[in-house]
Regions:
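N-terminal secretory/membrane targeting signals
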Residues: 1-19
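Alpha-helical membrane segments of multi-pass proteins
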Residues: 15-298
Length: 298
């Protein structure tokens, strides 16, 4: 039995290497095109190990946070390890789906999972003290407070999204693994900052009403980009011109599908998030009004 399992693992690894030999994945090779890049797998394993060790050590992490973080980590694996990653080298639409998972599924779920506390609990006490002292220093506090300001985080997310979809940069991701990795890292980093600011990161610097506004405006500018990709009569990314035919699509049709993914499903995610925060805002307003009424009666 172990030999059989090992054989299957070696087969999957071999197919993965063949799928990334410089040629775009073909339909008959898709399900074997898993991407076991150590630069992706090792950080995911380390994050999972630290998080669940921290949960075991602390025993105080709410279940809803554990579920959110687990779902976020699994969605990262789906985007970066599953055949979707290899398919993104052949189809722009798959590439867009991958990006939407990173920015609109993984990032908010990881933020809702609040992993910093479990990560700290997983470390030795001496390390925790040193990290605690380091984050309290003025330079670190200043940098963190700056990049997590709602307007700054919103701007970073906007710049990352629009800059990387400029043809001159996007085309480089199709020919350079390092540029492609930089794109994914910047998308995830910018989205983590944005959702951290939107969900307030635990410090309530921004009310729920402002959170709704930032989500709404982010939804608007991403929808505009999706609409431009969908409605454009011109091909933005010629790098896909010779890779979509095997999948029964022209490059322009593939681009239109990718634009629709950014336009419609992504718009739904922003709408749901905005409605949820709007309901929290109403509850918060009612609570404050009730408190004010009780104070007046006293």
């Amino acid at each position: 039995m172990p030999l059989k399992r090992t054989s299957w693992l070696l087969l999957i690894l071999a197919q993965s290497l063949l799928a990334h030999s410089g040629e775009p994945v073909q339909p008959h090779d898709l399900w074997g095109a898993w991407t076991f890049d150590p630069g992706v797998v090792i950080p995911l394993v380390i994050c999972a190990f630290l998080y669940y060790l921290g949960i075991y050590q602390s025993k105080v992490i709410p279940r809803v946070q554990i579920v959110a973080f687990t779902a976020g980590l699994l969605s990262l694996a789906l985007a970066l390890i599953s055949p979707l990653h290899a398919l993104g080298e052949a189809l722009f639409s798959a590439h867009m789906l991958q990006h939407e998972i990173l920015m609109l599924v993984s990032a908010p779920l990881l933020v809702l999972g609040r992993p910093l506390v479990p990560f700290l609990w997983a470390l030795p006490m001496s390390w925790r003290r040193r990290i605690g002292q380091a984050v309290k220093t003025a330079p670190v506090r200043s940098i963190w407070d700056t990049i997590t300001r709602p307007l700054i985080a919103w701007t970073i997310e906007l710049v990352a999204l629009w800059a990387w979809h400029a043809p001159v940069l996007f085309e480089k991701t199709l020919t350079s693994e390092s540029v492609h990795a930089a794109q994914h890292i910047s998308f995830l980093f910018a989205s983590l900052l944005f959702w951290w600011a939107v969900f307030q990161g635990g410090d309530r610097r921004m009310g729920y009403g402002m959170s709704v506004i930032y989500i709404f405006t982010t939804g608007v500018h991403s929808t505009i980009l999706g609409a431009l990709l969908t409605l454009s009569p011109n091909l933005w990314y010629p790098g896909y011109a010779n890779t979509t035919g095997a999948w029964g699509l022209t490059a322009l049709q593939d681009q239109q599908i990718g634009g629709l993914i950014m336009w419609v499903p992504a718009g739904v995610v922003f709408l749901v998030a905005a409605l949820w925060l709007f309901s929290l805002w109403l509850d918060e307003s009612k609570f404050r009004m009730a408190q004010a009424g009780a104070g007046n009666r006293i």
